[in-house]
Amino acid sequence: MGQKSNPIGLRLQVNRTWDSRWFAEGEDYGRMLVEDLKIRQYVFKALPQAAISKVVIERPAKLCRVSIYAARPGVIIGKKGADIEKLRKKLGEMTGSDVSLNIVEIRKPEVDAKLVAQGIADQLERRVAFRRAMKRAVQSAMRLGAEGIRINCAGRLGGAEIARTEWYREGRVPLHTLRANVDYAEAEAHTAYGVCGIKVWIFKGEILGHDPMATDRLMLDAQTTGVRPAREDRR
């Protein structure tokens, strides 16, 4: 029986790269890996209202550079930058090194897989009908420029006695085409009936050529210009 591979892991070093970008040997590798996990856990737990999509960690020399991609950067920065300074000090205590924080605004959270999945999970926890939440997310993504989207919800949906999986798809979502720019994320909804799992695939076009930084570059271009990155012409 065939199984779906993780679209992000499948495309690493093709048109995507890692969210932790550093090199270490021996004991330093394990220490830095644990630090990265603790940083991400703390950021997501401490700032649930900021709509954080991902945290990218780079370690040039003895500096730790943390980039937080969020739909509500004002929640992270706080009044006159007070909250971001507290966050920087806390992360510095966790890593034992100087921390540089960079906040990147996500202008279109409706086409960000992580934020879409988390939004559906939040609605399920508030007892919103799962079909309504899925359809609303699909319509918003397609309206704002996604070329295709697929959403899976699994668990005791609607309080049913037997767990099942429901899915909804619109547009085209290629799973095996490596040049496809497919954003993928998972989320959990902790309901009164148990845990429901949400998976989201969003197809944003194709990236031609071998460029591991292409996805990040397109995302940054979209934030600075405020327009959807155009699909590259076939050569």
From Swiss-Prot:
- Example of a GO cellular component annotation carried by this entry: cytosolic small ribosomal subunit
A Gene Ontology molecular function term for this protein is:
rRNA binding
| All copies of domain KH type-2, residue ranges | 39-107
Q: Which PROSITE patterns match?
A: KH_TYPE_2, RIBOSOMAL_S3
Pfam families given for it? KH_2, Ribosomal_S3_C
**Which InterPro entries does the entry link to?**
KH_dom (IPR004087), KH_dom-like_a/b (IPR015946), KH_dom_type_2 (IPR004044), KH_sf_prok-type (IPR009019), Ribosomal_S3_C_sf (IPR036419), Ribosomal_uS3_bac-typ (IPR005704), Ribosomal_uS3_C (IPR001351), Ribosomal_uS3_CS (IPR018280)
Has the keyword Phosphoprotein been applied to this entry? no
Keyword vocabulary terms for this entry: Ribonucleoprotein, Ribosomal protein, RNA-binding, rRNA-binding
Q: Does the keyword rRNA-binding apply?
A: yes
**GO BP field:** translation
Q: Which domain of life is it from?
A: Bacteria
The job of this chain, per UniProt, is described as: Binds the lower part of the 30S subunit head. Binds mRNA in the 70S ribosome, positioning it for translation.
Q: Which family does it belong to?
A: Belongs to the universal ribosomal protein uS3 family.
**PANTHER family in the cross-refs:** 30S/40S RIBOSOMAL PROTEIN S3, SMALL RIBOSOMAL SUBUNIT PROTEIN US3C
The UniProt subunit note reads as follows:
Part of the 30S ribosomal subunit. Forms a tight complex with proteins S10 and S14.
Instruction: Quote the protein name from its UniProt record.
Output: Small ribosomal subunit protein uS3
Taxonomic source organism: Sphingopyxis alaskensis (strain DSM 13593 / LMG 18877 / RB2256)
* Lineage of origin: Bacteria, Pseudomonadati, Pseudomonadota, Alphaproteobacteria, Sphingomonadales
